[in-house]
Structure formats: C-alpha cells, structure tokens
Amino acid sequence: MKWENIILCTALLTAITTACKKGSSGGNQPPPVGKKVIVTTFAGDGTDAYLDGPLLSAQFHTPIDIAISSDGILYVADYNGRRIRKISGGQVSVLAGDGNFGSRDGAGDTAQFVDPYRIEAAPEGNIFVMDQADSRVRRITASGIVSTYAGTGVAGFKDGDVSVALFREGMGGIAVGSQGDIYVDDTNNGRIRKISAAGQVSTFAGKASKGFVDGDTSVAEFLNPNAILFDKQGNMYVADNGNYCIRKITPAGKVSRFTGTATVGTADGGPGIAQFHYIYDMVLDKDGNLLLSDGDRIRKVTPSGEVSTIAGSTTGYADGDGPEAKFNYPAGLAIDTDGNLYVADAMNNRVRKISFK
C-alpha cells in the first residue's frame, strides 16, 4: 500500500474513534422478545497475516468487506492482503489477487489490486470490487477472471462510457439494482453514480457541491455518502456519513432524510433522536429492517426509522450475547438466507457471525 494510503486509513480510523468518544451515548436496546443475539467467530484466528485453510486457523490481513453469493459462498475483500478471499465448505481460499500492489487484470492468481475496499455479489455470479485508491470498479467472474468494469485509474469526475468514465479515489458503497445496473457511492465527488448494463456511467443523485439538500436527485446534496442498498420496493438508502444520517431515494427520484439527527453520536431511538457517527455498510433483513455497522456497534433500523443497537459496545474482541460482544472496526456485512449476519471485523482480522435465536 502507498504510504499516503496508510496515512489516510490511519487518519480515518482515528477520526471514527474520536467521533465515537465525542458523541452522546445511547444505551443498547434489548433484542425483540423471543430473539437472542449471539455473536461468534466464524473465520480467522486474529493474526494480521495471510493464510488459507480451515475457518478458524485461516488468517486475514484487514478483512474490510464481505459479500455472499446466491449459492451461499462468502467472499471477503482482504484489504491489506490485496486479495479477494473465498469461504466455502469450511475452508478459506483465494479467489483473486496475488497480494502485490497493482491493477493487472487476468486469471485470479495473477490479477492484482491496489486497495480492494468494497465487494458485492451480483445474482448472475459476478463479483464486483471497488478498488478505491485505483479509482476503478473491477469485476470477477465465478471462475476467478478479473477485468476492469469501469474507470481508467485516473481520479476525477466524468460520465460516459465505462472506458472513459472517471471516479474519485475513496469510493464507498456498491449495490446491484433490479435491472442489473451497478450503483456506486462516489464518495469524494458527493454523488451516487450508475453503471448501466449497457456500459454507460451516469450520475444517479448528487452534484458537485457537497452539503445537505433534499429534493429531486438532480438538486440533492450529500456529504461523504459511504454505503447504499435497495429495499424490495426499489427505494435506495444512503449512509450520508458527513451528515450523520441515512437518506432515502424513492423510485420517483425524491431524496429525503430517513433517520438520524445530523449530530454525531450513538443514541438509539426514533428518526428525530437517533444518532450515527460512521456507517460502513448496510444490509436488509427478511423483515425489511436495515442492519448496519456503525463504529464498534451493529445496529438495526426498522422500516419506520427506529434505531436500536443489537451487538457491540466498546472497542475490543469478545464473543457472546449481543450487548457483551465486542468488535474492532466492524465494516462489511452480509446476510444469508437463514438470516445469519456476517461481519468483516477488520481490525480483529476475523469474520464474525451473528445469529438470532
């Protein structure tokens, strides 16, 4: 990793930790009656290194994001390892990346990444990777062939064909739309970008000026959007981290504040009370709730915008019941068909599993 990227990541983590300490604290709310939240370690022995093998003896080098395919295979963006790891059949292996710094396309074990920061599994079997410091979106087929899907490696802003489109360094979330289009949080450009199945990049929401403005997608403003997802009705939810809230974009193209007070903190409660400080990722459960990683906590947001903390409290490492469990920069999330939640616990170099019983 380039030294400037190391400094950037360190500064980011410091800022997150500081924000957490400064924000007002809300007590953890208990899980719903009849539901117990259990946190366990699913993969990784906690060593900051690279080693394939059985789940609990495998090693990761800052696992930053996680995705699950339609056939139940887990994929992990091993950020500082510059690899995409695969978890299947109780074993951890490499899908793509040779561990060296670069942007080379090709077969899995010869391809290279700069900073594989975000990962998303598409229904047809492709894996999309946000190579953030390289300003590219990469695609990996099920057989492990890596190609550049959009972006040139030059940081900037430009819509158009995927071969000439430009993104800024530090891209955030990625989501797959119902028509197969790819949506990207172009965080430092303050925009949500759309990559159509036909290979055209356009601006879906946001503009050059950054701030907080609701309204049509063409006039709306965001400040460091970092995670996106769609619900079953086609609404997009955006973690607008610079504004410390979650925004909602309807299929009609209207942007509004969904929940959060725009004040940094960890308070639980309704849309006008709840606080956030840094949402890394969001997933949707079968009941339509948003599950999100926010600081050292895993939180739930109901369809009405009510926020509660279901696991985690202070920084550390501990399995157990939700409120007693500890994480160290829980980042990417993925949910399986049984409702189990998988967490890329980045600074603990582990993949954690949250079961609801």
How should each PLM-predicted stretch be described?
Residues 87-91, 140-145, 195-200, 249-254, ...:
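Short loop/turn segments that connect beta-strands within beta-propeller blades
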Residues 82-85, 135-137, 190-192, 244-246, ...:
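Structural signal for beta-propeller blades
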Residues 73-75, 126-128, 181-183, 235-237, ...:
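Conserved beta-propeller blade signature
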Residues 329-357:
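Blade-level signature of beta-propeller repeat domains, shared across WD40, Kelch, NHL, RCC1
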Residues 1-40:
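Bacterial Sec-dependent N-terminal signal peptides
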Residues 79, 132-133, 187-188, 241-242, ...:
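Short loop/turn segments immediately following the C-termini of beta-strands
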Residues 68-71, 121-124, 176-179, 230-233, ...:
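Residue-level detector of Asp-centered blade-edge/turn motifs that repeat once per structural unit
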Residues 34-64, 91-117, 145-172, 200-224, ...:
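Gly/Pro-rich loop segments of beta-rich domains
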